[in-house]
Amino acid sequence: MDPVDPEVPPWHHPGSQPQIPCNNCYCKRCCYHCYVCFVRKGLGISYGRKKRGRPAAASHPDHKDPVPKQSPTITKRKQERQEEQEEEVEKKAGPGGYPRRKGSCHCCTRTSEQ
């Protein structure tokens, strides 16, 4: 093992940081990219500010009227459109519902060969 300069902080030692920078991808490979990615993406732990929604004001006029029911024709059209989209996805996917391309992630540039 090579000697390390004692004046250099530990986070700047050789091999302490991954060669490829972290990204926003949540695929399995990117979740195990480094310790930070594993904690944030794999375990879902973040120490950032928690956003909480405020309760709606009861005096506001928009909150008093109930939501009108949708006509059955609109819901039928939505169902038909959703079924068509599912069929398109099944056509694009290979056997078992997996994409035909093997070993590549659609959201990052790395493939299984790397």
Curated annotation (Swiss-Prot):
Record PTM = Asymmetrical arginine methylation by host PRMT6 seems to diminish the transactivation capacity of Tat and affects the interaction with host CCNT1.
| Motif Nuclear localization signal, RNA-binding (TAR), and protein transduction: where in chain | 49-56
Site described as Essential for Tat translocation through the endosomal membrane, positions? 11
Annotated region Transactivation: the residues are 1-48
Record PTM N6-acetyllysine, positions in chain = 28, 50-51
Record region (Core)? 38-48
Q: Which UniProt keywords apply?
A: Acetylation, Activator, AIDS, Apoptosis, Host cytoplasm, Host nucleus, Host-virus interaction, Inhibition of host innate immune response by virus, Inhibition of host interferon signaling pathway by virus, Interferon antiviral system evasion, Isopeptide bond, Metal-binding, Methylation, Modulation of host chromatin by virus, Modulation of host PP1 activity by virus, Phosphoprotein, RNA-binding, Secreted, Transcription, Transcription regulation, Ubl conjugation, Viral immunoevasion, Zinc
Q: Where is this region: Interaction with the host capping enzyme RNGTT?
A: 49-84
Binding of Zn(2+) 1: at which residues?
22, 33-34, 37
Q: Which InterPro entries match?
A: IV_Tat, Tat_dom_sf
GO molecular function terms attached to this record: actinin binding; cyclin binding; metal ion binding; protein domain specific binding; protein serine/threonine phosphatase inhibitor activity; RNA-binding transcription regulator activity; trans-activation response element binding
Q: Where is this region: Cysteine-rich?
A: 22-37
UniProt binding sites for Zn(2+) 2: 25, 27, 30
The lineage's top-level taxon is Viruses
**Biological processes annotated in GO:** DNA-templated transcription; positive regulation of transcription elongation by RNA polymerase II; positive regulation of viral transcription; symbiont-mediated perturbation of host chromatin organization; symbiont-mediated suppression of host innate immune response; symbiont-mediated suppression of host translation initiation; symbiont-mediated suppression of host type I interferon-mediated signaling pathway
Q: What are the annotated GO cellular component locations?
A: extracellular region; host cell cytoplasm; host cell nucleolus
This protein's domain notes: The cell attachment site mediates the interaction with ITGAV/ITGB3 and ITGA5/ITGB1 integrins, leading to vascular cell migration and invasion. This interaction also provides endothelial cells with the adhesion signal they require to grow in response to mitogens.
- Additional remark text: HIV-1 lineages are divided in three main groups, M (for Major), O (for Outlier), and N (for New, or Non-M, Non-O). The vast majority of strains found worldwide belong to the group M. Group O seems to be endemic to and largely confined to Cameroon and neighboring countries in West Central Africa, where these viruses represent a small minority of HIV-1 strains. The group N is represented by a limited number of isolates from Cameroonian persons. The group M is further subdivided in 9 clades or subtypes (A to D, F to H, J and K).
What name does UniProt use for this protein? Protein Tat
Supply the source organism for this entry: Human immunodeficiency virus type 1 group O (isolate ANT70) (HIV-1)
Q: Corresponding gene?
A: tat
